[in-house]
Amino acid sequence: MVPSAGQFALFALGILLAVCQALENSTSALSADPPIAAAVVSHFNDCPDSHSQFCFHGTCRFLVQEDKPACVCHSGYVGARCEHADLLAVVAASQKKQAITALVVVSIVALAVLIITCVLIHCCQVRKHCEWCRALICRHEKPSALLKGRTACCHSETVV
């Protein structure tokens, strides 16, 4: 049984979606266990207003046991006060986005070429008498077929 063009296109689209999902979730945890509840007493409190500008690129948290502020940095920043840009994180995120974009574009182009090819093959198999198909086939026909006494594919004439 030969799969149809539609089945093949759906299969290719399924593979594309699976690859994109795998790339997107490449750093996620493998277990689906629910998160464990935190202790009732937290080690962090909100920073007082006097430390509202303590973190440059992050969120301020006040460490209860040490009685001092600490920062939770935004993505792409590091340091005690989130003052340094993490260039490796920025470059890695940019490259990942470019790779996903390139993969999607190449897959869409390949899928379009595949669908067009399948439609053309189907057209020429079902409608062999179609002028357009005949012109396409006859353009590649070699005259040697006529010299050997065979029937030409485009003409019903036989050369003796």
From Swiss-Prot:
Query: In the UniProt record, does the keyword Kinase occur?
Result: no
Biological process, per Gene Ontology: cell surface receptor signaling pathway; epidermal growth factor receptor signaling pathway; positive regulation of cell division; positive regulation of cell population proliferation; positive regulation of epithelial cell proliferation; positive regulation of MAPK cascade; positive regulation of mitotic nuclear division
Signal sequence, renumbered to the chain:
1-23
Which GO molecular function annotations are given, in alphabetical order? Answer: epidermal growth factor receptor binding; growth factor activity
Sequence ranges on the Cytoplasmic membrane side: 125-160
Q: What InterPro entries does the entry give? A: EGF-like_dom
Q: Which SUPFAM superfamilies match?
A: EGF/Laminin
The residues on the Extracellular side of the membrane are: 24-98
Secreted listed as a keyword? yes
What does the subunit comment say? Interacts with the PDZ domains of MAGI3, SDCBP and SNTA1. The interaction with SDCBP, is required for the targeting to the cell surface. In the endoplasmic reticulum, in its immature form (i.e. with a prosegment and lacking full N-glycosylation), interacts with CNIH. In the Golgi apparatus, may form a complex with CNIH and GORASP2. Interacts (via cytoplasmic C-terminal domain) with NKD2.
What is the name of this protein?
Answer: Protransforming growth factor alpha
Query: What species does this protein belong to?
Result: Sus scrofa
